[in-house]
């Protein structure tokens, strides 16, 4: 299989004051390196950057890349403020600090078909018999995300919930949000139980542990959830999505200042390009991503 030239993969995470979050990013990137080796990319240079609370920053990491471009992969599950504003601003700052910087920018990790497989992996880890069709048919799921002030991001979560229920035959899958939108996870659990659901479980749609993950778990268990899954973390499916995003972006890497059909409108003059639809998404029949 032909792969694009091996430019560095710079994975940019939100960052947190909770040390568990940075440790989880480290574990995920170790999984990415291992999966890359299995896919014929044994020398892949993988680096971590953070938008807030942790070091190094994205401009710092990009400034340390020598001899060529880098592919920036947001470790974010939805396209919202961080991907639409924070990352472009930091890319612009990096370009100003490093003349001639070449950057290929990938899309966010979600939506992607493999992420529902990762969610089911974590539910399985929590004791839910996700491989039993009879259990799925009698189990209602709360898909608990961080939540956003961007309605489009929350709509993405709602669409994921509907698609997951349809494709896998859960009794119901409903979205819930730990902040900025409703219903909250505890409210969603109570609503399902009041509606006759005999068994309600909560699937935590977060990459790393921290304040939101703890909040979701406490509220869900307090409302009577039978199980609450852990964060996605270094699940193999997540590592594969990171690689999919990287390969799509790296294959479209360009020289700074050049034009390209998929250059992001936020900063085409910087040579910042968005990764296109991946081979995995085409194979799974996923709808095209909107930039």
Outline where the language-model segments fall.
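Active-site-proximal alpha-helix that buttresses catalytic centers in soluble enzyme cores
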Residues: 1-291
């Amino acid at each position: 299989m032909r792969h694009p030239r091996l430019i560095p993969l710079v994975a940019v995470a939100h960052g947190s004051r909770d040390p568990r979050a940075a440790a989880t990013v480290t574990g995920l990137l170790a999984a990415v390196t291992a999966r890359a080796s299995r896919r014929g990319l044994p020398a892949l240079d993988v680096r971590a950057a953070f938008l807030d609370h942790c070091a190094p920053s994205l401009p710092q990491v990009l400034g340390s890349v020598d001899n060529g471009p880098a592919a920036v992969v947001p470790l974010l599950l939805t396209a919202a403020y961080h991907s639409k504003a924070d990352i472009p601003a930091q890319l612009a700052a990096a370009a100003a600090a490093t003349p001639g910087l070449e950057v290929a920018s990938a899309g966010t990790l979600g939506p992607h078909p493999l992420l529902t497989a990762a969610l089911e992996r974590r539910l399985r880890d929590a004791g839910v018999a996700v491989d039993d069709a009879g259990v799925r048919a009698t189990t209602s799921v709360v898909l608990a995300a961080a939540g956003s002030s961007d309605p489009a991001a929350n709509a993405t979560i709602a669409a994921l919930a509907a698609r997951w229920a349809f494709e896998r035959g859960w009794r119901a899958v409903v979205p819930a949000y730990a902040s900025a939108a409703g219903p909250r996870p505890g409210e969603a659990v109570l609503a399902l139980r009041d509606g006759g659901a005999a068994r309600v479980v909560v699937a935590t749609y977060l990459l790393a542990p921290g304040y939101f993950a703890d909040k979701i778990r406490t509220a869900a268990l307090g409302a009577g959830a039978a199980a609450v899954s852990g964060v996605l973390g270094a699940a193999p499916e997540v590592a594969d999505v990171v690689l999919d995003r990287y390969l799509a972006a790296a294959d479209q890497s360009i020289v700074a200042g050049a034009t390209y059909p998929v250059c992001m409108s936020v900063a085409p003059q910087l040579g910042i390009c968005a990764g296109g639809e991946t081979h995995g998404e085409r194979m799974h029949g996923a709808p095209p991503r909107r930039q």
